[in-house]
Amino acid sequence: MRSMIANYNDAGLDLSYDPEFYALMAESFERSVGRRLAPESQGAEWLYDRSPAVVLAHNTDADPRFIYANRAAQACFEYSRDEFITLPSRLSAEAPNRAERERLLNAVAANGFIADYRGLRIAKSGRRFYIEKAIVWDLVDRSGCRRGQAATFDSWQDVQAD
């Protein structure tokens, strides 16, 4: 299967149910992590609409922008799909935590993935929360070209206001 979408950096792509983008995420995850991203009988629709885990992806821009956020991600971060896919991914962390986030992304780029990540994030409303046991991996197509990075987690904990 050859992808019809050559550049995920184009703004406005709706990848919610795109089977080729789903294959990129699922195959990259399985190659890197050694297990499936979704149950074998499920695909793009299940991952977007029904997965209990948050799944996010950003592109390879110099200032990466989210290109995918499933419904669990939208609920967790309080952004609509249209808001998410125009958002630079650095804005999912507060300014003091962006250097830590950058170190995480560099570690993923060097190793292909990391597991068991914990980090502080911020929702649209300003609600702060820790993501727990996140897996972050590179999106690499079948020809070895890096197309972005993705993350999944199913556990988070709100930070109590002082």
Please report, for each region that a protein language model flagged, where it lies by residue.
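Sensory/regulatory domains in signal-transduction proteins
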Residues: R2-Y8, G12, W46-D162
